[in-house]
Amino acid sequence: MEPAAAAPAQRLADPTGEDQALAAAAAEGGRCPDPALSAAAPSGGNGGAAREEAPCEAPPGPLPGRAGGTGRRRRRGAPQPAAGGAAPVPAAGGGANSLLLKRGRLKRNLSAAAAASSSSSPSSASSAAGGLPASCSASASLCTRSLDRKTLLLKHRQLLQLQPSDRDWVRHQLQRGCVHVFDRHMASSYLRPVLCTLDTTAAEVAARLLQLGHKGGGVVKVLGYGPPPAAAPAASDQTLDGEHGRDVEPPPSSGTVGAVRGPARAPPADLPLPGGAWTRCAPRISPAPSDSSPGELFAGGPGSPPRAPRPASDTESFSLSPSAESVSDRLDPYSSGGGGSSSSSEELEADPAMPHRPGRPAQPRPPSPKTSALLQPKAPTGVDSTGVIAGEGPGDDKAMAAAAPDVPLSTSGRIRETVQKTSPPSLYVQLHGETTRRLEADEKPLQIQNDYLFQLGFGELWRVQEEGMDSEIGCLIRFYAGKPHSTGSSERIQLSGMYNVRKGKMQLPVNRWTRRQVILCGTCLIVSSVKDSVSGKMHVLPLIGGKVEEVKKHQHCLAFSSSGPQSQTYYICFDTFTEYLRWLRQVSKVASQRISSVDLSCCSLEHLPANLFYSQDLTHLNLKQNFLRQTPTLPAARGLGELQRFTKLKSLNLSNNHLGAFPSAVCSIPTLAELNVSCNALREVPAAVGDMQNLQTFLLDGNFLQSLPAELESMHQLSYLGLSFNEFTDIPEVLEKLTAVDKLCMAGNCVETLRLQALRRMPHIKHVDLRLNILRKLMADEVDFVQHVTQLDLRDNKLGDLDAMIFNNIEVLHCERNQLVTLNVCGYFLKALYASSNELAQLDVYPVPNYLSYMDVSRNCLESVPEWVCESRKLEVLDIGHNQICELPARLFCNSSLRKLLAGHNRLARLPERLERTSVEVLDVQHNQITELPPNLLMKADSLRFLNASANKLETLPPATLSEETSSILQELYLTNNCLTDKCVPLLTGHPRLKILHMAYNRLQSFPASKMAKLEELEEIDISGNKLKAIPTTIMNCRRMHTVIAHSNCIEVFPEVMQLPEVKCVDLSCNELSEITLPENLPPKLQELDLTGNPRLALDHKSLELLNNIRCFKIDQPSAGDASGAPAVWSHGYTEASGVKNKLCVAALSVNNFRDNREALYGVFDGDRNVEVPYLLQCTMSDILAEELQKTKNEEEYMVNTFIVMQRKLGTAGQKLGGAAVLCHIKPDPVDLGGSFTLTSANVGKCQTVLCRNGKPLSLSRSYIMSCEEERKRIKQHKAIITEDGKVNGVTESTRILGYTFLHPSVVPRPHVQSVLLTPQDEFFILGSKGLWDSLSIDEAVEAVRNVPDALAAAKKLCTLAQSYGCHDSISAVVVQLSVTEDSFCCCELSAGGSMPPPSPGIFPPSVNMVIKDRPSDGLGVPSSSSGMASEISSELSTSEMSSEVGSTASDEPPSGVLNESSPAYPNEQRCMLHPVCLSNSFQRQLSSATFSSAFSDNGLDSDDEEPIEGVFSNGSRVEVEVDIHCSRAKEKERQQHLLQVPAEASDEGIVISANEDESGLSKKADFSAVGTIGRRRANGSVAPQERSHNVIEVAADAPLRKPGGYFAAPAQPDPDDQFIIPPELEEEVKEIMKHHQEQQQQQQQQQLPPPPQPPQPQPQPQPQPQPQPQRHFQMDHLPDCYDTPL
C-alpha cells in the first residue's frame, strides 16, 4: 500500500511568542520558526513512513493529520466518500492554506489565502515532498496568518472547551471531575479534557490517551474499574458536542488501536482497558476536525523513532517541539547553570463563566485532609505525591543519555527507542510550572487535583469540582500524557543550523559531505543522522576536554573532536564567515572547560542519566529538587547505587528529592566531604554513614529524624551537622563524640527543656541554635558555668524568664519574640544583645559589658534606660524604641562610641538640657511628648546626619550656630506632625547640607524665599498639611530637587517646579489652584504629577496634551453625577507613593458603584518589590468577586473563593512572584435593600483594614506570619525551612499570601475574612499596605483621619505620615468615609444562636448588648439602644425642628404599667434604636393619645404649630407612619405573659391607622407602654413613645419618602399624589369605626390577661411642664458616657 502523504502540521504555539516566531520566519524567508513534523504510520503494517516538513503558513489549530483511507474526516455537510476510497490529497504547492480553505477554516482575507495557494511553485512542492525545508512565499503566507491567527486560535481553543453537556455530566455526582491533560501523543501540544472519577487511575487515563494517539481532539471519558456500565440515557451518552459522534470499539488483537467511524449521533461504546477498566470516548466533531486513519500510531509512541526538531534558522536558538522527545534528553549536562524546567509557557483560553446552579443543596464539607497525606503516591511514608515533599518524576529531562560508556556513540539513538518500547504509557503531574513527576499506575489524578485545591483553601467539594473544570488551573497543577517538554532545556541550545557535515578523517574518500542539522547545546555537539533531521539517531559529541580546529583546505570549515580513547571527529562547513567565527568562539569556550562540576538540579530526574558517567573525575554533583528515589521504578534505569563509581566526588547535593530512605550507596564514596540530603522524608540514618571518614558537612534538615546512630562518632572531621526542622525532643548524645562540630543547629524541632548538663558534656559546641522550638525553661542541674558557648539563639520560643548568667563567655544572645519579663546576662564578653518583642520590665547585665556594640531591646515594657548602658564604652547602636521610657540619661550622649540612638515611641518629655559634644550620627526621637529640643543639640552634635523628631509637640527649633558660619552636616531632617510656626524656618539655613526636609502637618503659613534660596543642596521637601499659600520662586535654586510634596495647603499659584531639571515627583493635590503655567518642554525626568483635589483648576487642551506625556498624571475627572440608585453612604479617597528605587509596587482598587450600584468594593495590593502582581490583582479581582457572588452569598465563602481563584488567574506570574492583598466589600441587606449594610474584609499578607467605630479603631484583618502560633505549626509540618530573618525558604515572611505558588503548601492564598454590620457609629475605614501599618499604629491612623473631613486629603495624610516616620517601601492607602443613618440600621433580631457574644474588649462598655452578623466569633459589637450609642441622629435635624415637630410632651409621671419584678422583660430580645427596650423606672416621654398630629392632642397646639388644612392630617413638614417593620407582633403571644393590662383610651379627636393591621390583628395586640426607655430623637424629629408604637412607626397623612438623611423625611411642600387624605364627609364615620375597634380590643385584653395586682389609675394627659431635675440626673448617671442626646 502506498504510504499516505503527510499533511502539514503545526503545534499549538504560545500566543505570547507567536509574533516573534512570525518575525523569525519572515527573516528566514518564510521557513517555519517552530516546526513539528507528524509521523505517518502505514495502514498495513509496513515499515515505510513518509514525512513532510510543515510549511510556515500552517495556522495553529487541530492537526489535520495524515490523509489516507477512511481516516480523513469530511467537512460538515459534505457528501460521504465511498468506502475504501482514498480522500484526495491536497496539492503540495498549495500548502496549508489550500487545505484549510477547502475545509472552510479561513473566514478572513480569502483573497490573500487564494494568492498564497496559487503562487506556490512546483519546485517548492517537490522540495517539501523530498523532506527538505520548504521555501514558500513569505509575503502571502505571513500576511494570511497574521490576519487569521487570532480567529483560528480562538476557534481551535473553543474546540477544547467543555460543553454544557460535559459539565452537567460532571456535576451529576460529586465523585466525578475533569482533569485537563496536555496530550503529547498529538503532533502538537493539545489540552484535552478528561472526564473521570475519583477512582480513575493514572494508568487508565494514560492507556486511553495512548489508544487515541493523535486522532481528533475531543473530550475523553474514563470511568475507571468495574464492569461495563449499563446503558445510560441518551443525554449522557450522546457525543459531547451534541450533534455528531462515533463509536469506539475495543482494540484488535494485533495491538494497534483502531477508530471505527460510526453514524452521526450514535452514542459512544464502552471501551475495555487493561486491568478491567472501562472508558468512554466522545471526540467532538468540528467543522475542521483532525484526520485519522485506522491503525496509525501516535507520535512518539512505542516503536516510533525519536525525533529532533528542525531549527528555526542556521544560527539562532530554536524551540523544541513538544510533540517529540526533547532534544535535550540526549544532551550532555555538564553546563555551569542548572537550567531547570521553568514556568509553563502555554497560555490557555479561560473558560466562560460557570453558570450558577440554583437550588443545589449545600454539600457537606469533606474532612480537612492532612497535609502529609493529601497527595500521597505509592512512595515511602511521609512522601508527598504531588512532588511537594516526595514522589517520582519523569526521566532525565535536562540531559538524557546519548550512549553509555560501553556503548558506541553511533548507537546512542536506539537507547531511547528501547526505553520507549519497554516503558508503559505514563501520566505526569506538574505543580506551579516547575518539575514534573511521573504518576504511579495506581495513583488517581482527580484525587490529586482535588487534594491540591483543598490545600489551597476551597471548602466545598462541589466548588472544587467546578474549579477543576477550568483549563486555567494548569498554572497551578497540570497533567501531561507523555513526558512534557522542558522549556529550560531549549534555553541551553546556543547555536544551531543546517550545514554540510562529514564524519571521520578527511583523507578517507568514503565519508562524503552531507547536509545535516547541527546543534550546540550545553557542552555537546549534536548532529542528526538523516536528512529530515527529526528521525533516526542523533549523534552526540562531548566537547569538554576536546578541541576545535580550523580546516584550511576547505572554506569556513571547522573540525570538532571529542576527548578520550574513542574520540570522534566531525567536519562542518559553514555557509558564511560570520557563522564560522560565531561557532569557533563559542565552541572554543566549551572545549576549554574541565569536567569537574555538574548541575542537574530541577530536571525532573527519577534516575541518573547515562551520560553523567562519561567522566569519572567529577568532584561536585548537584541533583537537588528532582524525583530521585532509592531504587528507580524503571528496570533499565540507573539508580543512586551508581554514584559510588565517582571515586573523586567531594560534594553531593541530593536535597529535596523523594528518597524516603537514606541512600546507602553514598556511604561507599570515600572522598565525599559534603553531603546534603535535606527534605527527603528521612526517618532514620543508617549506621553505615560512619564509613564516610572524610565527611565535613552533613545536612539532614527538613526530615522526620528523632535520633542519630552512634556510628556518627567515627566522623572525626565532621564540622557542621544540620539537624534543623526535624522531630528531635532533646540534644542527641552522639554529638558529645563529634568534637569537630562547633555549631548545634536544631532550629524548628520539638525541644521543650534545654538541659544545660548535656551542653556541658559538649565543650566543642560554640554556637547553639534552638530557635523556633517550644522551649519553656533552661534546666541547670549544677551551678557550674557553661563556658564554651559563645552564641546562643533562643528566638521564637516560649520562655518567660531567662537567666543567662550561667553562660559566662556569651558573646551574642538572641532571645527575640519570647515572653520574657526578666533577663539576666553575663557581660564579660557580650558583644550583641537582641531582646526585642518581649515583655521586659527588668534587664540586668553584669558586669558592665565593655565589648557590647549592638543592643536591641525595643518593643518591651522598660521604664528607664539601665545605668550600665551608659558605661558600656563600645556601644554603637542602641534601640530602645516602643517602650515606656520617660527620660534619657545625659551620660548616654557622652558615649564617644555611640553612633545610632533609636528612642522613638516612648514617653520622653524632654532631652537632656546641657549636652556636651556627642558623636551620635542618627537620632530618632519620634512619637514622644517633647516640647522643645535642647538649645545646644545641633551645635554640639556636629556629627549628626539624621534627626527624626516627628510626632512630638515642638514649637521651635534650636539654632545650628550662633554665627554665620556653621559646621552642621545634617542631611535628613524629619519634623512632621508638630506645632512648628514660621519662626523656625530661618533656622533651617544653618544646615546648608540638608538634602531631605519633612515639615508636613505643622502650622506654617509662609516659607520665605530668601531662606529657601540658601538650601541649595535640598533634594526632597515635604511641606504638606500646612497653610501655605505659595511656594517661593527661589526653589529654582535647588537644582538637585527631585521631589516636591505640598498637598493639603492653600496654594493658589502654581510654583516654579517645572523649571527644576532633576524633578521627578510633584504633588500639589488638595490645594486651591485655578490655573497652571507650563514651560514649552517638561522636565525630562518628571514621572509623577498629582493635581487632584483642586476643584477650581481648569486646564486648556494644550496643557492637557502636554501633561498627558507624564507617566503618572493625576487630575480630577469631571463629575458625571451619582449613579441612579447608589446610596450616599460612602465616599473614598486613595493615594499611592513610590518606594525603593522609585518603583511603585502597590496598587489600589476603588469601585464606588459595584454591581447593581448599591454595593462598593475597595482593595489595596502590595507586591513588596515586584510591580506585576499588584497590577494583575487590581485589574482582575473585582471581576472574580462579581462572579463568585453569583455562586454563593455567604461572606466568608465568596471572599475565600475569590482569593483562591485569583491565585489561578495570576498564571505564570504568580509562580515565582507574590503579593499581599486586602479587599473590602460593602453590600446591603439582600431582603431590605434600603436597610443595613454589611462590610466584609478579607486579607492575606500584611495589608490590613481598620474600621473606626465610635472614634476607636477596630481591626478587621490579621497578619499570618511566623509569630502566629497556628501558622508556625502548619509550616513546620510541611518541613519548610524558616531562615533567620523569619521568612519561608528565605522568600516571604507571610505564610498566607497570593502568588509564590512554588512555596506550596507552606504558603497558601486562603485569606482571613471578617464581616461586620455597619452602624451609625461607624465613621470610616482604612485600607493600607504593609508600609503604612509598619509605620503607623491603628490608633494613630484612626486619630489622624478623624480630623480630616475629606477622604482624599485623609489618605494623603496617612501616606505622608508613614514616609516621615521612616517608611521606605511603596505605600498605598484608601480611606472610605461612611454615613450610615439611623434609618438604615437595625439590630432588633437576635442571631440564630440566640445567645449574645461577649463584648469587644476596650471598645464598648460591658453592659452593652451586641449583635454579630453570621460571625459570632469575631467579637465585633453592634450597639443596642440601651447603650446610648445608638442615639446619634442625622445632622439634617435642627433644634428648632425638634422643638416644633415633636408631638409629645415630657412628663415626670411614672409609666402606666410596671414590669413584673419576678421576670425580666424580654430577657433574650435585642432592640435597635427604633425599638428600644424599656428600662424600668426610667425617664420617659408619653405620647398624646396616639394621634396623627399634636394639633389634635388634649394639650392643644404647640406654639410653633400651624392650624392643619382641612382633610389633611399632618404636623408640618414631617409625617408619622405606623408600620410594623420588625414583625414584632408575631411575638406578641410569647410576650403577653410578661405584660400587664393597660387600658387604652379612645380618642375622639385623632385617628390611628396601622399598616399591616386587620380587624383580628387589632383585637390581639397588646399594649407596650411598659416597654419603653429614654426618649430618642428620630430622623423625622419625633421622640420614641412609650406605647405599643414602640414596635411600629406611627401613621400619618403623608406617604413617607425615603431620603438619605432620614428614614421618613417628607417634603416641605406635600405632594398631593403622595398624601393620604380622608375626605371631610367621611371623617366622622372613620372615627366611629376606629373607636369601635379600640373598645373591642380592650375587652379582649381584659379577658385574656389576669388583672394586675395594683391596676394603674388612668392618668390625665399632663400639661407641658419642666422635667424634675433630680430624677433626670439620677437616670443619666446610669447611662453610658457616650449618651449625650439632648432632649
UniProtKB/Swiss-Prot annotation:
Residues 1-96, 230-406, 1414-1465, 1604-1687 are annotated as: Disordered. Keywords: Acetylation, Apoptosis, Cytoplasm, Hydrolase, Leucine-rich repeat, Manganese, Membrane, Metal-binding, Nucleus, Phosphoprotein, Protein phosphatase, Repeat. Its cofactor is Mn(2+). The modification Phosphoserine is found at S286, S372. LRR repeats lie at residues 594-615, 617-638, 648-669, 671-692, 694-715, 717-739, 740-760, 764-785, 788-809, 829-850, 851-872, 874-895, 897-918, 919-940, 943-964, 969-989, 993-1014, 1017-1038, 1040-1061, 1062-1083, 1085-1106. Induction: Up-regulated in the hippocampus upon chronic methamphetamine treatment. It is found in: Cytoplasm; Membrane; Nucleus. SMART domains: LRR_BAC, LRR_TYP, PP2Cc. It comes from the Eukaryota. GO terms for molecular function: metal ion binding; protein serine/threonine phosphatase activity. Binds 2 manganese ions per subunit. The keyword Manganese applies. Residues 78-96, 1424-1445 have a biased composition (Low complexity). One of its GO terms (biological process) is regulation of T cell anergy. Its EC number is 3.1.3.16. The modification N-acetylmethionine is found at M1. Protein phosphatase involved in regulation of Akt and PKC signaling. Mediates dephosphorylation in the C-terminal domain hydrophobic motif of members of the AGC Ser/Thr protein kinase family; specifically acts on 'Ser-473' of AKT2 and AKT3, 'Ser-660' of PRKCB and 'Ser-657' of PRKCA. Isoform 2 seems to have a major role in regulating Akt signaling in hippocampal neurons. Akt regulates the balance between cell survival and apoptosis through a cascade that primarily alters the function of transcription factors that regulate pro- and antiapoptotic genes. Interacts with the nucleotide free form of K-Ras (KRAS) via its LRR repeats. Interacts with AKT2, AKT3 and PRKCB. Interacts with WDR48 and USP12. PANTHER family: LEUCINE-RICH REPEAT-CONTAINING PROTEIN, PTHR48051. This is PH domain leucine-rich repeat-containing protein phosphatase 1. It comes from Mus musculus. The gene is Phlpp1.
